[in-house]
């Protein structure tokens, strides 16, 4: 089972995945980051697929061309499962057909509540009492793919965005590796994520 992890930042989720004993074949980042260093230290192939070649972070960013380039990287390495781990680029195009049902993402809320980049802020602003983390299948529509697993996090009085996000991350670092392992087992047996894993509350 060849697993690729997509990162953009500190690599804390990647560290949790590796600490869980999951074998990772490839780590890809859209920018220079600590996640690539973690991969290198673990003797995992690390690849910088920089956004700068495709328009950077401007309105001219060619999302489809970038996604196609990433698809090529995955194809040539015969990747079976992709885990987005704090990856900061929204993908588009053929990659979701090529790897349909085989791209996982983790989100800091109990989807379908609070999709998007500001999930933690939105939950606090809404006065929610409970939020959490969701592992879902990534699709063309951001944060709208089938839910694979969820775990709740209680919002405490006096919580800030930083304090709540940190507690969500603590739960995420347990739930995501568990889910990746479960999904990998299903795929290795020739199954598919949808219909094989029952979404549920965990943790």
Feature locations, PLM:
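One-carbon transfer enzymes
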Residues: 1-203
């Amino acid at each position: 089972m060849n697993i690729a992890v997509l990162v953009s930042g500190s690599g804390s989720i990647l560290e949790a995945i590796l600490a869980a004993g999951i074998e990772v074949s490839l780590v890809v980042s859209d920018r220079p980051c600590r996640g690539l260093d973690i991969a290198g230290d673990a003797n995992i192939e690390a690849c910088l697929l920089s956004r700068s070649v495709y328009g950077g972070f401007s309105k001219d960013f060619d999302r489809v061309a970038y996604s196609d380039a990433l698809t090529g990287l995955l194809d040539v390495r015969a990747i079976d499962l992709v885990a987005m781990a704090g990856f900061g680029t929204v993908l588009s195009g053929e990659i979701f057909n090529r790897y349909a049902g085989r791209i996982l993402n983790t989100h800091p809320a109990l989807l379908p509540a609070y999709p998007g980049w500001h999930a933690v802020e939105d939950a606090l602003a809404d006065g929610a009492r409970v939020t959490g983390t969701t592992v879902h299948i990534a699709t063309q529509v951001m944060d709208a793919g089938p839910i694979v697993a969820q775990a709740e996090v209680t919002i405490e009085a006096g919580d800030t965005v930083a304090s709540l996000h940190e507690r969500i991350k603590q739960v995420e670092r347990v739930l995501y590796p568990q889910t990746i392992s479960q999904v990998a087992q299903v795929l290795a047996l020739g199954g598919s994520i949808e219909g094989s894993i029952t979404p549920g509350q965990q943790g």
